[in-house]
Swiss-Prot record:
Annotated source species: Helicobacter hepaticus (strain ATCC 51449 / 3B1)
Top-level taxon in the UniProt lineage: Bacteria
Protein name (Swiss-Prot/TrEMBL): Histidinol-phosphate aminotransferase
Taxon lineage: Bacteria, Pseudomonadati, Campylobacterota, Epsilonproteobacteria, Campylobacterales
Family, per entry: Belongs to the class-II pyridoxal-phosphate-dependent aminotransferase family. Histidinol-phosphate aminotransferase subfamily.
Catalysed reaction equations from the record: L-histidinol phosphate + 2-oxoglutarate = 3-(imidazol-4-yl)-2-oxopropyl phosphate + L-glutamate
Length: 370
């Protein structure tokens, strides 16, 4: 009855919601700190909340399927024409569009060894072979080597570059990304995932990707962005892709109608306008990131310098699954990375008081179990 390809797919395990912790552990919602899904700990712009309240009565209407207002606002924000933009229910959906639309006959896709899990899921659903870099140590060099070796064996239909990379947090320089795109064949689509780009660009200008420059220089690249992270709209599910007019037109052929809701489009439109809120969130993230790095050094954790709104801790003497379960029982949701084959855990950078509590809990765990 079902496709054989589904047997190869491990169901994606999303970050645990607060409601699940309430049900399983009987902890009051107000006593739970959720730092496992890289949501914006500062919530949503007050302007967005006000707009949603004013427009809630429109929930019965189908959305404007042209997404005219948001597409034009994004076009203005990135200084491109609206014909270069496609909007999806999260940037995940645009990844799905890419995998559905590409010609994968006798082809494969390339991705990093440790990266966003949905790349692999959507590639497998498309029935395409996957090749990964052997490690995460020298990622650009490994991508070059992997591309050169694999293209002799089988056509490469797409390459995923996550910048910054989730769940590790490292980020390629924008110039290095362009260097790689320049080197690949023109019939290979390079998918540049910038879900956390706002944080990276603030921390290091060399990491700042310019989508306009990318699509002007290259006809085989698509840049992905999202409103789920710094814009605080994870629950609204809005993402976007910026690419050549030809790529966008092909993706529209697999896009279902009304794929983003009326209220989600309205929320994203207002969120994009409130750049004061965005700037404050980015600055606060940088301040709190420094606290996490200092804490890691104090406790002897190895950490991966992060350009996102999260940090990944490695500790050879701690079993990450045991630690994450203990933290969960004490009302703290973080992301165990055992499913990636790593003895590591990822923590979203929260508000100051949340982070203080994180430090207290981890210290308490170490005192009990060391």
């Amino acid at each position: 009855m079902f496709r054989s390809a589904l047997k190869q797919i491990v169901t994606y395990e999303a970050g645990k919601p607060i409601e699940l912790v309430v049900r399983e552990y009987g902890i009051k919602p107000e006593d739970i700190i959720k730092l496992g899904s890289n949501e914006n700990p500062y919530g949503t712009s007050a302007q967005v909340v006000e707009s949603l309240q004013k427009n809630a009565h429109k929930a019965f209407l189908y959305p404007d399927d042209s997404m005219y207002e948001l597409k034009n606002a994004l076009a203005s924000h990135f200084d491109v024409e609206s014909k270069h933009i496609i909007i999806g229910a999260g940037s995940d959906q645009i990844i799905e569009f890419c995998m559905q639309a590409l010609n994968h006959h006798n082809a494969q896709v390339l991705m990093a060894k440790t990266t966003f899990a949905m790349y692999e899921v959507y590639a497998k659903l498309a029935g395409v072979e996957i090749s990964k870099t052997p490690s995460d140590e020298h990622i650009l060099e490994e991508f070059f080597q992997l591309y050169q070796s694999e293209k002799e064996r089988k056509h490469i239909s797409a390459v995923f570059l996550c910048a910054p990379n989730n769940p590790l947090g490292e980020c390629l320089d924008a110039a290095a990304i362009e260097q790689f795109i320049q080197a690949v064949d023109k019939d290979t689509l390079v998918i540049v995932d910038g879900a956390y780009q706002e944080f990276a660009a603030y921390k290091d200008k060399a990491k700042a990707i310019n989508p306009k420059q990318l699509i002007e220089r290259f006809s085989n690249v698509i840049y992905l962005g999202t409103f789920s992270k710094v814009y605080g709209l994870g629950g609204m599910r809005v993402g976007y892709g910026i690419a050549s007019e030809h790529i966008i037109s092909m993706l529209y052929k697999v896009r279902p109608p009304f794929n983003v809701t009326t209220l989600s489009l309205q929320a994203a439109l207002i969120a994009l306008k409130d750049q004061v809120f965005v700037s404050e969130c980015i600055k606060n993230n940088a301040i709190e990131m420094a606290r996490y790095e200092a804490f890691a050094n104090e406790m002897g954790f190895t950490f991966i310098p992060s350009y996102g709104n999260f940090i990944t801790f490695l500790h050879s003497h701690i079993e990450s699954s045991h630690l994450c379960d203990w933290l969960l029982q004490n009302g703290l949701i973080v992301r165990n990375l055992r499913s990636y084959g790593l003895n590591a855990f990822r923590i979203t950078i929260g508000r100051a008081e949340q982070n203080t509590r994180v430090f207290e809990l981890i210290k308490a765990y170490l005192q009990i179990h060391n």
